Amino acid sequence: MARSLRRSALAALLLACLLVSPVFGVKASSLPEPNGSSDSGQVYLNKAADAILALKSTRFSLKHEGTPAFLDEKNGVMFTAADCAYSAPDRVSCDIKASLKNGTIVQLTRVWVPEGTFQTNPLTRQFAKAPADSNFNGVMLFAKTGIPEILRTEVQKAQVVNREKIQNRETLHVKGEVSGDKLNPLIGSTLKPELMYRVDFWIDEKSANTAQLHVTEPDAKGWLIELFGTDEPIDIPTPTLPPSPKGKPQA
């Protein structure tokens, strides 16, 4: 009986070893464990930066949580959410949901192309040059000095949190802190430059593409950016402006 029990125990041990062996297809993960070191978190932030710079195109959404943020402070236009498309290297189009001073909700389109920044009139839907002092630059998100630079050099206390499923994708959740000064060019100068803000990144384990990015502000406010549909065909033409009134050339 004792010999039989020993044989059963040995067989169970061998089976357990075989099940976790790479030879049988269950590969030991090379990813850092949750709550890993800042060095391991930075490794994945660097990979995500490379992936953004390699993008041919992507669709993304941008949402401000809590009270709306200014899209055009001079004219009192407040931003709430946007559905956008990016075509490398320098074309972005966003359908934006905004509110006016009187509380009216409007839809407008803003386009960033090499020829300039254009925006539709919420009433006529015709394009014109966007106000020069408008906040938020969609192209800046994907520029070398945008999200990629933040991922590489500006995230303090980077730490792997966990593996999580986002948009049906297996992602690695990395958190850290970034100064408002570095984040403001990306999200429209809404943060205090001298403060540090928690930023969470969800990075696709297979492609290293950023699936989601969240900036946490005080008072239950924040910014959420979600990326999807990467490297699909996207065409963002330069908007056609309406004819200028006689004697008043378009700026």
Where are these regions (language model features)?
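N-terminal leader/targeting segments and the immediate start of mature chains
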Residues: 2-91, 164, 234, 238-251
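Flexible, membrane-facing loop/turn or short amphipathic-helix motifs
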Residues: 66-75, 102-105, 182-192
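An acidic-aromatic
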Residues: 83-145
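Gly/Pro-enriched, hydrophobic low-complexity segments
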Residues: 170-243
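Extended lipid/amphipathic-ligand handling interfaces
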Residues: 45-50, 81-88, 110-114, 199-205, ...
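Short, hydrophobic/aromatic-rich segments at coil-to-beta transitions
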Residues: 54-61, 88-95, 168-175, 207-213
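Generic short beta-strand segments
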Residues: 61-69, 95-100, 175-184, 216
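A short, amphipathic edge element
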Residues: 149-160
